[in-house]
Amino acid sequence: MYPWQDFAIQPDFSDKIALRTTQGDMLTWIELTTKINQTVAFLQKKGVNAESAVAFVGKNSEKILFLYLATIQLGAKVLGINPAFPQEKIAKLCEFYQIDFCFYDKDLLNLQEIDVFTQKADFFRPATMTLTSGSTGLPKAVVHNVQAHLDNAKGVCNLMKFDCNQSWLLSLPLYHVSGQGIVWRWLYCGAQLHFPEDDFYASLLKTTHVSLVPTQLQRLLDYLQENPSISFATRHILLGGAHIPTELTQNMLKYGIETYSGYGMTEMASTVFAKKSDRKQGVGQPLLGREYCLVNDEIWLKGAGLAMGYWKDRQIVPLTNNQGWIQTKDKGIWQEGELVIIGRLDNMFISGGENIQPEEIEQVIIQHSSVNQVFVLPQKNKEFGQRPVALVDFNEPFSKSAVENLMFFLQDKLARFKQPIAYYPLPLMLEKGIKISRKQLADWLAKRDEIN
């Protein structure tokens, strides 16, 4: 049996709350499993079987979650697609990955329960396909089985003290590996999963655990400061997606909220390294069951959460090298007992003969109190070949004085050749998911340079 089926028949769990909906309604494990069975019946009526590949397009909703789990229960493969993608790209993805059925949230209305054929649970069968945030062309579809998701979940639950008496907010999209990571931690423990309600931060504070990106953490801190008398259940926050300002995590401690910073990737089913946030730059040590090694400064990974491969031509193509490791293309060093991520090997550029790693510069810039988010990119330069420029989102309107303050701050913190020669407002309209694409930013910068 799959976890939800198991909890539905266990006396200690069957009548316990499993899910809190966007409307604030509660579903027990029995009621949840009934909803999933109704969705299984819907899928079977449409012709979905164990050999099918099914896609869903939509923002997080109860029906999308039921579809995700029902597809797995049927033994089919499920692929989530970002609803912000243009229709043409969605069609191209479905064609390229030979998707048999594509459902939108509006397709999942009026589900009725009928007798369903129950596929025997197979934890090692291909179950999920998750798109990577590919920088060029179509993203790759990473295939995981249920066991890999549960193995990944176990390590995070152990670190963050997550058990059946806790709750986690589904704050990240299900089409992204980070959103799926939340679901599998919930299913690993038999805990509660909460959907955000209209007031995101009010519903967040009803949960014990939550996953956020740093900009959301800053907004949460602002919310707590604006509502000093509010009571809250939140005690643990997993951070990801960008550089994390130390001042921000230290401020959360004043509210009794522990934050955790880490390092993960789609191919490993989410988080691989993590630790309680501190003043050091590293991401901690590998979580339970993960293995790593550094080869010519490149991080290689295997172990708990490792994907089966990439989906191509209705087959699974291996993603590991001959030694069984996935080569991440991330540059890292082991320092003071933990892994420190230097940046992407393919982000590095040369300026006047000097190697420049953009993430190293970003790590310094983000420590300035006025900076929410920053990306450093190479800009063509006749004398040096390329020079660094910074795209910045300040927590105040972008202005000459804000830039000058930042430049003064960097004078004694970065070597001169690493200091950006120009600053531009970060074009936030490019944000389509959890993180902004460097490729899109580079294209935006190139067009800007052409115009000027």
From Swiss-Prot:
The cross-references to PROSITE patterns, in alphabetical order and at most eight, read:
AMP_BINDING
Q: In which pathway does it act?
A: Quinol/quinone metabolism; 1,4-dihydroxy-2-naphthoate biosynthesis; 1,4-dihydroxy-2-naphthoate from chorismate: step 5/7; Quinol/quinone metabolism; menaquinone biosynthesis
Under Enzyme Commission nomenclature, its number is 6.2.1.26
What GO MF terms are annotated? ATP binding; o-succinylbenzoate-CoA ligase activity
UniProt xrefs under Pfam families: AMP-binding (PF00501)
- Top-rank lineage group of the source organism: Bacteria
- Could you tell me the Gene Ontology terms of the biological process aspect for this record? menaquinone biosynthetic process
Keywords annotated in UniProt: ATP-binding, Ligase, Menaquinone biosynthesis, Nucleotide-binding
Which reaction equation describes what this protein catalyses?
Answer: 2-succinylbenzoate + ATP + CoA = 2-succinylbenzoyl-CoA + AMP + diphosphate
Q: Report the function annotation for this chain.
A: Converts 2-succinylbenzoate (OSB) to 2-succinylbenzoyl-CoA (OSB-CoA).
Instruction: Tell me which NCBIfam families the record gives.
Output: menE, PRK09029.1
**Family the UniProt entry places it in:** Belongs to the ATP-dependent AMP-binding enzyme family. MenE subfamily.
Q: What is this protein called?
A: 2-succinylbenzoate--CoA ligase
**Origin organism of this chain?**
Haemophilus influenzae (strain ATCC 51907 / DSM 11121 / KW20 / Rd)
